[in-house]
Amino acid sequence: MATKLFPKFSQGLAQDPTTRRIWFGLAVAHDFESHDGMTEENLYQKIFASHFGQLAIIFLWTSGNLFHVAWQGNFEQWVTDPVHVRPIAHAIWDPHFGTSAVEAFTRGGASGPVNIATSGVYQWWYTIGMRTNQDLFTGSVFLALVSAVFLFAGWLHLQPNFQPSLSWFKDAESRLNHHLSGLFGVSSLAWTGHLVHVAIPESRGRHVGWDNFLSVLPHPQGLAPFWSGNWAAYAQNPDTASHAFGTSEGSGQAILTFLGGFHPQTQSLWLSDMAHHHLAIAVIFIVAGHMYRTNFGIGHRLQAILDAHVPPSGNLGAGHKGLFDTVNNSLHFQLGLALASVGTITSMIAQHIYSLPPYAYLAIDFTTQAALYTHHQYIAGFIMCGAFAHGAIFFIRDYDPEANKGNVLARILDHKEAIISHLSWVTLFLGFHTLGLYVHNDVMQAFGTPEKQILIEPVFAQWIQAAQGKTVYGFDLLLSSSTSVASTAGQSVWLPGWLDAINNNQNTLFLTIGPGDFLVHHAIALGLHTTTLILVKGALDARGSKLMPDKKDFGYSFPCDGPGRGGTCDISAYDAFYLAVFWMLNTIGWVTFYFHWKHLALWQGNVAQFDESSTYLMGWLRDYLWLNSSQLINGYNPFGMNSLSVWAFCFLFGHLIYATGFMFLISWRGYWQELIETLVWAHEKTPLANIVYWKDKPVALSIVQARLVGLVHFSVGYIFTYAAFLIASTSGRFG
């Protein structure tokens, strides 16, 4: 008999008489493939419609950011003095605040308690030409309307008349053209337009708004140089080194330049360089989006491109033959590729946001820089682990050995032992040697002979930095040699600005590196390779291994196949993902520790502290972690509190959540099942309490679910703890 209970998408689960119904229902809510009566066409339609919901949420969120800053922030005051005014994210109202808390949180010129923004939105909005609260409100209302449009579009595409067909979803060439030209290309062109027409004039003290944007020329010659082919005119007369951002003082007329380096006052990339960059991307992508064959019978067919990719000698198999259908028919493969790309790009954003700051005055807001770097690195880690998870699901659910005979996928599976054992060798080598060096150095420090430490200069990395123009090492190579071909070729175009930037201590582009950097670099390499080993092994063994050849029949996540086979626990693809996330968090911990400590030393003008203490483990524990957590450990005491008290509490609370995770990770379900049965007995025997009864019989979580719950607590606690540490230690030092 059909039941109306949750989950509606699975009658089997809905009829389960235990609490398993709820937890399994939540676990498979997004696994559309497994839902009752799901067809391939319906699967694609559901996912397509959900994308609109995702976009609606994103636009609503950004709209909310704009709205709260316009309503409760101090954007107009901040614009007048970005160096000294602290940007306000929003007001705080809390009935628990005592007088000291109200005073501590009343900052940035506000009349009551507020949160300080560390997201960089003030710098971003200022750079792109916003100046007033009215600008922010207008943007907020516009984005809220866009959000509503996307919600409607999502609903519309679930209606029978507006649901695209399966063939439409499988039309790879049309989708590529649309995404390349339509999304990447045209949006980059639109952004160039905004920078040229609004942001650059505002940076030169000329307001452009809805009232005058059609009559204000972004360049004195208008479109004449474009039509006449004299494009160089747009690069002539750029802003000078003495340009005061936001005013006409020292400003020029150029709109598309190749100056290199940073604006001396704001320490951010030149707006005219960024406009040029986006224009170039727009041209490339709009051209790229016309390469694939659709309606007119011209252009490339992806299947033909892939089938032609066969190694010429014949000794390397069938190359990319069969890949078109394999990728085009597997959503997990496509998602894996997308996540791998987006994850890599997100990590690159983390690196670029501090080394090449695009937003005015971001370089002097140290807390925001640290927060943005850490935020993007953590997100990159989770996304990249997800790429391998979906790669493994592809191998279990979608991979067809017959359709991929001898091609690159089949060959990777055939060579998996070699791949996995090489990764294992690399991790062992990196781990033992790096730890060996650190521990040796610790022992030398402990025994009072620091001069006996093994300190290795990263000469290859310094050589690469010198080639890019860093002169401090005295290598006299390529761009660091004024007479080299590389230097003379770019001297009149982009080099003066770049060379000034790379050798200037005002920014953190190409940091000077030494033995401490060499060691932590290899520690991070160990973390990356170990994470990769676990993920790659999980995906390549997902279909089966010598130990368990029929593994794919058990699905993505199974605890084990009973006691009879011996040793089939902990080898599902999900278990590999689960283990890899711990290593990912561990690695990103080292990455963010390195970034943060290196920058704290630079920002304080005390690089010797990092250089001397980073070569041994006690240095990291004592001079980075302990020294910088002192304010948090003493956060609120009998003598009062301060604006860091909330972070001190968050630091404590993060540890608590993290520790709770181990309760799920170290015990198995038998313990909990016994405990639950005892509690059920007590409940049934207690007068009054036993009047209340449950519809679902309480049972313990499954092994797989408990691992997930433990992992989530571990991850959330880990991130809360480090976020509190990072923001408090940075803002406590620099205000």
Swiss-Prot record:
GO terms for molecular function: 4 iron, 4 sulfur cluster binding; chlorophyll binding; electron transfer activity; magnesium ion binding; oxidoreductase activity. Chlorophyll a B1 binds at H655. Chlorophyll a B3 binds at M663, Y671. The keyword Transcription does not apply. It is found in: Plastid, Chloroplast thylakoid membrane. [4Fe-4S] cluster binds at C560, C569. One of its GO terms (cellular component) is chloroplast thylakoid membrane. It catalyses: reduced [plastocyanin] + hnu + oxidized [2Fe-2S]-[ferredoxin] = oxidized [plastocyanin] + reduced [2Fe-2S]-[ferredoxin]. It comes from the Eukaryota. GO terms for biological process: photosynthesis. The chain crosses the membrane at residues 47-70, 136-159, 176-200, 274-292, 331-354, 370-396, 418-440, 518-536, 576-597, 644-666, 708-728. Keywords: 4Fe-4S, Chlorophyll, Chloroplast, Chromophore, Electron transport, Iron, Iron-sulfur, Magnesium, Membrane, Metal-binding, Oxidoreductase, Photosynthesis, Photosystem I, Plastid, Thylakoid, Transmembrane, Transmembrane helix, Transport. InterPro entries: PSI_PsaA/B, PSI_PsaA/B_CS, PSI_PsaA/B_sf, PSI_PsaB. Signal peptide: none annotated. Its EC number is 1.97.1.12. Phylloquinone binds at W672. P700 is a chlorophyll a/chlorophyll a' dimer, A0 is one or more chlorophyll a, A1 is one or both phylloquinones and FX is a shared 4Fe-4S iron-sulfur center. It is a multi-pass membrane protein. It is an enzyme of class 1 (oxidoreductase). The keyword Cytoplasm does not apply. HAMAP family: PSI_PsaB (MF_00482). Belongs to the PsaA/PsaB family. PsaA and PsaB bind P700, the primary electron donor of photosystem I (PSI), as well as the electron acceptors A0, A1 and FX. PSI is a plastocyanin/cytochrome c6-ferredoxin oxidoreductase, converting photonic excitation into a charge separation, which transfers an electron from the donor P700 chlorophyll pair to the spectroscopically characterized acceptors A0, A1, FX, FA and FB in turn. Oxidized P700 is reduced on the lumenal side of the thylakoid membrane by plastocyanin or cytochrome c6. NCBIfam families: psaB. The PsaA/B heterodimer binds the P700 chlorophyll special pair and subsequent electron acceptors. PSI consists of a core antenna complex that captures photons, and an electron transfer chain that converts photonic excitation into a charge separation. The eukaryotic PSI reaction center is composed of at least 11 subunits. This is Photosystem I P700 chlorophyll a apoprotein A2. It comes from Chlamydomonas moewusii. The gene is psaB.
